[in-house]
Regions:
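Structured, basic alpha/beta domains of bacterial-type, RNA-associated proteins
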Residues: 2-12, 18-70, 79-136
Length: 136
């Protein structure tokens, strides 16, 4: 096992920010103090589990990962947590093989998604939608 004691990694998605604290342990993963096994909704839990499944039990069962997530919606938070976990595992193992496996599965696990919401403009309800024009 690496000589590192604690590793802090962050992940972002839209407006959600996740900070993961990784330390040697026995495979406990908590998101905002909630164990991953009972984290709701189910879709978000599956999203967070993706890097763990890709990495394999032998890597993450030796670590305790505590994640604090804030901002955004539940899916944005899940993807931010997923990115934080993936980057933490990469930093902990220093494995290029694991990195290529993550990128082949889904690039946004390792590299951030730059897309953001376009600001609203006047003359309509959204960024591009315009108010309906009336001829009478």
């Amino acid at each position: 096992m690496p000589a590192k004691k604690v590793l802090v990694v962050s992940g972002k998605r839209k407006t959600a920010v996740a900070r993961a604290v990784v330390k040697p342990g026995m495979g406990r993963i908590r998101i905002n103090m909630t164990p991953l096994e009972i984290y709701q909704p189910e879709v978000a839990r599956q999203k967070i589990m993706e890097p763990l499944i890709q990495a394999g039990d032998e890597i993450w069962k030796q670590l305790d990962i505590d994640i604090k997530v804030s901002g955004g919606g539940y899916m944005g938070q899940a993807e931010a947590a997923r990115m934080a976990i993936a980057n933490a595992l990469l930093k902990w193992t220093k494995s290029t093989q694991l990195r290529t496996a993550f990128i082949e599965y889904d690039r946004t696990m390792v590299v951030g998604d730059p897309r953001r919401k376009e600001p609203k403009k006047f003359g309509g309800p959204g960024a591009r939608a315009r108010d309906q024009k009336s001829y009478r």
